[in-house]
Amino acid sequence: MEEVGDPRLARCMQVLSVIGDLWTLAILMTLQASEMRFNELQRAIPRANAVTLTSRLRKLEDAGVVSRTVESRGKQSTVYALTPFGRRLLPIVDAVRAVALDLERSDEAPS
């Protein structure tokens, strides 16, 4: 990450680097309602392939945004959920979604 002088700005850039990609936003929006198994996430975000989804989930887990729990009731499955920190990011995600909808309605292009 590029070095910036102001530590507060550096922290902002760190948060944006975690949530600032298409599939990450899709994961956060999808997990907003409830925890999900990997296969449920794949079905909910069909354009994200398994490798990309796995990569983003690991990145989010490493950043403390998503928790990963392995369940072994009968067949083993992995459940993903937003952590309390991940839930704190939801207003940012919602704001990005609202701006995107406004731009779509007005046909404005971001410059």
Language-model-detected regions and their locations in the chain:
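N-terminal helix-turn-helix DNA-binding core of bacterial DNA-binding proteins
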Residues: 2, 6-52, 63, 73-81, ...
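Amphipathic alpha-helical dimerization/coiled-coil segments
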Residues: 7, 11, 29, 81-111
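Residues within the DNA-recognition helix of helix-turn-helix
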Residues: 56
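Alpha-helical DNA-recognition elements
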Residues: 59
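Conserved catalytic-core motifs of GNAT/GCN5-like acyltransferases
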Residues: 69-71
